[in-house]
Design a protein with these regions (language model features):
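Carbohydrate-recognition beta-sandwich/jelly-roll modules
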Residues: 101-459
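Aromatic-lined carbohydrate-binding/catalytic grooves of carbohydrate-active enzymes
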Residues: 410-495, 499-557, 581-584
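Active-site-proximal substrate-binding groove within the catalytic cores of carbohydrate-active enzymes
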Residues: 112-124, 141, 295, 305-313, ...
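Hydrophobic transmembrane helix bundles of membrane-integrated enzymes that assemble
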Residues: 460-463, 506, 566-579, 680
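Sec-dependent signal peptide cleavage junction
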Residues: 22-38
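N-terminal Sec-pathway targeting helices
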Residues: 2-12
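Beta-strand-rich N-terminal accessory domains
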Residues: 34-43, 68-151, 750, 767-777, ...
Length: 789
């Protein structure tokens, strides 16, 4: 039930835009309606600047570092006074002979070039080196020319616009190409600080590089950024860190958290296709302009790269809500594969100039997005553990140590089974909407009894469409609709479920309001974009518009409803299609909220819900919700099928298994039934079904829950059969971390767990055998002690 959202213009006019100091970008044109990120296109990287002619650049060869005079006995550089601004650097890779020691830990050593602030990190035991610039050994093979050759060598790139020119287009400039000067360079206790001065465009961007025990961090200090007459749009800091080109006999890939995760594999034949990956962390912000796309939102601010035995995993630690992930395959911009955060400071939006028409112009806001620090941490992996499973393991450790996630404690030896029960929905009638009953509270008890009678244990119920008016009636959720049994009927059902030790969560959406209840007035309480337009969602079933609720207004409503959930006896709330899943700024002056403030508001709702009721479930949750949720429902288990992305991987599932339970799509709505069942087994996901007591086809035409095959009686036998297989595969490893994942052969996948158990899934229509194991066609086996070498 994930939804796209659209914008509808309001009374905002051009005069308002001009008075607010907004920037005209180009003449009005057709306006895409759906909130998401732009598709791959070279122009999205920013038009090259003509600030300088391209310089041919030959990189200096690698050299041994000088003796560590600047290091203390403990191996860490002492803070040094700030140096004067450096002369403009040459258009070339930094000379490694001039690098100096900056910091050292037990595992790593940091070196820096005080002319460019480029750095390299050495793994002391293995001798492997990660550079913030292209590998000098591979650079002579680079054939790209012009501005992008300079961009690849630069420690920082910026995209900007000239606000004083109404015809200005966004341009990209590198610090090297813009006659860059390095100001205020100084060594610190953990690394170094410096300010990149773009002398042509007049940007000054202060940064820091600091080393941890097994990682290195890059930092941008937003509040110290200086702009001249031009307006900063985004920044890529050390974009080529860890970059690599294809090598024969060497496995290499980029990991992007698209959906469940995906690989961009290194390939020998570069096509010069300018396609690349670019996606907003936590999805698009509906308060700004977004192109239509089917790409999965980016839920986890993490990425990685492997080149042979050398690998890193990058984490956007702070400021990620204003970040995008940018990944370029080899051939897009030179021979190198690279992946980096793209930090957003301004973004485009549509300034409407009419009430009812979609006329207006695209523009950028005057104010920058600002957070205290924008931090990227690069964990450097050891040579023997450098695949994507090792990256996920390192990220999981980070979530436990720094984000408050805790290892899971299963309540039963049986795996969880999630039953979504649909109370009611509405569909279009002759004169007014028609109410469709799916499951009364009495019938809900019958569903539970049927599941228990068929041997399905460890059951959790999520009851949706219980509110007055059914699932598609948004706003004023309480009381429970009398046609389903009212509050008393719901209490009786929950009491019965509790007698069987079954928790009941009530499904709720506070993101939309279609009925004006709760004192909601769209004009006063609706979420607004930067032009002042009230934002609305278009229901694809009936094309009717529903107002998006201001996040702070929604938080107040959710908090006020907690006492009523508690009175019913609910064990928690399942937030779907909103809280914990979508993140938007709000320019409603009554409830103004930046993206950062909206994030904290959502975290507050989740925390209050858990404290009041004991449990919180979220649909396909973003990272910032994970430390509060008990369960992630309908977690993405595939990817967006970009043409340059090669294959999906269960990166998110490897991270989460053993920390929080998760399901994939409802089992009775699978498109490829057997393959998707096997994928759930491979990914360690638990079973979930959506049920009604009404017969199949009864919900046809409903605005939201229109699915045909939901009659629980049609699924009891199949659900019980699958539940046994889920228990066979996952019952013993509910609290175990996934430690490995690989292909044994085409369409034969192995998932390894702590303690030695492995699950081998064969998607082929023929049996698989390798002399150690035999896996039947379209089936799986469990190997308790793991595969022998």
């Amino acid at each position: 039930m994930s939804r796209n959202r659209v914008w509808v213009t309001s009374a905002a006019v051009t005069a308002v835009a001009l008075a607010a100091g907004l920037y005209l970008l180009r003449a009005p044109g057709d306006r895409p309606l759906y909130a998401a990120d732009p598709p791959t296109a070279a122009a999205a990287a920013g038009a090259p600047s003509a600030a300088q002619a391209a310089g041919a650049a030959a990189g200096a060869g690698a050299a041994q570092p000088p003796p560590p005079e600047a290091a203390t006995a403990a191996g860490t550089a002492q803070p040094q006074p700030a140096a004067a601004a450096s002369a403009a650097p040459r258009l070339a890779l930094p000379d490694e002979a001039g690098f100096r020691p900056a910091a050292e830990s037990a595992a790593l050593k940091l070196w820096v070039d005080d002319k460019t602030a480029h750095f390299k990190v050495e793994h002391k035991q293995s001798g492997q080196t990660w550079r913030s610039y292209p590998d000098p050994e591979q650079w002579p093979k680079e054939t790209i020319t012009g501005n992008w050759r300079n961009n690849l060598m630069s420690p920082i790139m910026a995209e900007y616009i000239d606000a004083s020119n109404s015809k200005s287009q966004a341009k990209t400039i590198s610090w090297l190409e813009d006659r860059g000067a390095l100001e205020s360079f100084q060594l610190t206790a953990g690394g170094f600080r410096a300010t990149f001065h773009f002398t042509g465009t007049q940007f000054k961007i202060p940064v820091e590089v600091r080393m941890k025990e097994d990682s290195v961090e890059t930092v941008i200090y937003d509040r110290e950024i200086k702009e001249g007459k031009l307006s900063l749009l985004n920044v890529k800091l050390y974009p080529l860190f860890g970059s690599a080109a294809y090598k024969e006999q060497e496995e290499g890939y980029v990991v992007v958290p698209d959906g469940s995760g995906a690989l961009i594999r290194f390939k020998p034949n570069l096509t010069n296709d300018k396609s690349f990956y670019r996606a907003s962390v936590y999805g698009a912000d509906s308060a700004f302009f977004n192109e239509k796309t089917a790409r999965n939102p980016l839920r986890l601010p993490v990425f990685g790269m492997k080149a042979g035995s050398r690998a890193f995993v990058g984490v956007m630690v702070s400021g990620e809500e204003y970040g995008k992930l940018f990944a370029a395959p080899g051939g897009a911009f030179g021979q190198y594969y690279w992946v980096t955060p793209e930090w957003q400071y301004r973004t485009k939006y549509f300034q409407a100039t009419g009430k009812k028409t979609q006329t207006g112009f695209f523009t950028y806001s005057k104010d920058r997005f600002t957070v205290p620090e924008r931090v990227t941490r690069y964990y450097l992996l050891e040579p023997g553990r450098s695949d994507y499973a090792a990256m996920a393991d390192k990220y999981r450790t980070y979530l436990i140590k720094e984000k408050g996630l805790k290892p899971l404690r299963p309540k039963s030896g049986d795996v969880p089974f999630y039953a979504d029960i649909i109370g009611a929905d509405i569909k279009k009638g002759l004169l007014w909407d028609k109410y469709i009953t799916g499951t009364t509270t009495t019938e809900a008890a019958d569903i539970v009894k049927g599941l228990l009678a068929h041997g399905i244990g460890n059951l959790t119920v999520q009851y949706a469409g219980w509110q007055d008016g059914g699932y598609s009636s948004y706003g004023g959720l309480f009381p429970v609709d009398s046609r389903l049994g009212g509050n008393e009927g719901m209490k009786r059902f929950i009491d019965y479920a509790h007698s069987e030790r079954i928790p009941v969560y009530l499904t709720a959406n506070y993101t939309l309001n279609s009925n004006g209840r709760d004192g909601f007035w769209p004009m006063f309480d609706g979420m607004r974009d930067l032009s002042g337009t009230v934002l609305e969602f278009e229901n694809p079933a009936n094309r009717e518009m529903t107002t998006l609720v201001s996040p702070k207004f929604a938080a107040r409503l959710a908090d006020g409803d907690l006492k009523m959930y508690k009175e019913l006896g609910a064990d928690g709330v399942y937030y779907n299609e909103g809280i914990g899943q979508y993140l938007n700024s709000d320019f409603n002056s009554r409830y103004s909220a930046s993206r950062s403030e909206a994030l904290q508001s959502q975290r507050g709702i989740l925390k209050q819900t858990k404290e009041a009721l004991g449990g919180v479930n979220v649909e396909n949750a973003n990272l910032y919700a994970l430390d509060q949720v008990d369960h992630i429902h309908r977690l993405a288990d595939t990817y967006s099928y970009d043409i340059f992305v090669d294959e999906p991987i269960p990166f998110a599932q490897i991270v989460l298994h053993g920390l929080v339970t998760y399901t994939s799509e409802w089992s009775n709505l699978r498109e490829q039934y057997r393959n998707e069942f096997l994928r759930s087994i491979e990914y360690g996901a638990y079973p979930a079904y959506v049920f009604t007591s009404a017969s199949s086809g009864s919900m046809k035409g409903a605005y939201s829950i229109w699915y045909y095959s939901m009659d629980y009686r049609d699924w009891l036998e199949k659900a019980a059969e699958e539940y046994k297989r889920f228990n066979e595969a996952l019952g013993a490893v509910q609290d175990k971390f996934i430690t490995g994942h690989r292909a044994l052969a085409p369409n034969v996948m192995e998932t390894a767990y702590e303690g030695g158990q492995t699950v081998i899934v064969n998607y082929n229509e023929q049996d698989y055998s390798d002399g150690r194991v035999r896996v039947p066609a379209q089936d799986f086996i469990v190997v308790k002690g793991g595969l022998k070498p």
